[in-house]
Design a protein with these regions (language model features):
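Interdomain/boundary linker segments immediately adjacent to catalytic/signaling cores
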Residues: 1-53
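Catalytic core segments in nucleotide and nucleic-acid processing enzymes
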Residues: 45-188
């Protein structure tokens, strides 16, 4: 009985740990996009999650706002577009007329055994988006892309492009490719 309880507790801790890794990966990408919007002098305001409106961008408060990223459901940009955060898709790139221009799925898990499952979850989210917005750009950012997952992603018409999160963080060229793509989508 005790062994069963310990096994169950271990699985719960493992699951919670994996969820935390995924949540943190999303926050990394959210912060990266906000910092890039600041660099491009495009950030206007943070959109509060609790429905109390917007919080104007203030350079003096940026680090505090980035540290409390979960309090926001997105940001508004100078060209009247928005970057919105949610659970599915993880990030939406929304145009002036509330049209979805693109979506980003962030898969932060690093266990190779779960790579196909994460790919499948992203694909499902992208299919849902494309039913509503057939011209939307779909971007997968994953920490672990196995050869099998890469082969499927390369053949998958629902995924416009994909990036390895570790490469985006470590390699300036990959970072630049990602942000250029995202901000070109937002410029429509």
């Amino acid at each position: 009985m005790n062994a069963l309880l310990l096994t169950s507790t271990g699985a719960q801790i493992d699951g919670a740990w994996r969820n935390a890794i995924g949540d943190e990966a999303e926050k990394v990408v959210q912060r990266l996009l906000i910092k890039e919007a600041v660099k491009r002098t495009m950030l206007v305001a943070f959109i509060n999650k609790n429905g109390t409106g917007i919080e104007p961008y203030n350079d003096a408060k940026l680090e505090e706002q980035l540290g409390n990223i979960e309090a926001y459901r997105g940001v508004k940009l100078t060209n009247q577009t928005s970057i919105l955060f949610s659970s599915e898709p993880d990030i939406s790139l929304v145009g002036k007329n509330n049209v979805t221009l693109g979506v980003i799925e962030v898969k932060g898990g690093t266990d190779p055994a779960g790579a196909l499952e994460r790919y499948g979850a992203a694909k499902k989210s992208f299919e849902s988006t494309l039913r509503e917005a057939p011209d939307a750009k779909t971007i997968l950012i994953a920490s672990c892309i196995t050869p099998e997952a890469k082969e499927r992603i390369d053949k998958d018409k629902t995924i416009s492009c994909y990036f390895n999160l570790t490469e985006v963080i470590k390699e300036k060229q990959k970072y630049t490719e990602l942000v250029e793509l995202i901000f070109s989508v937002l410029h429509g």
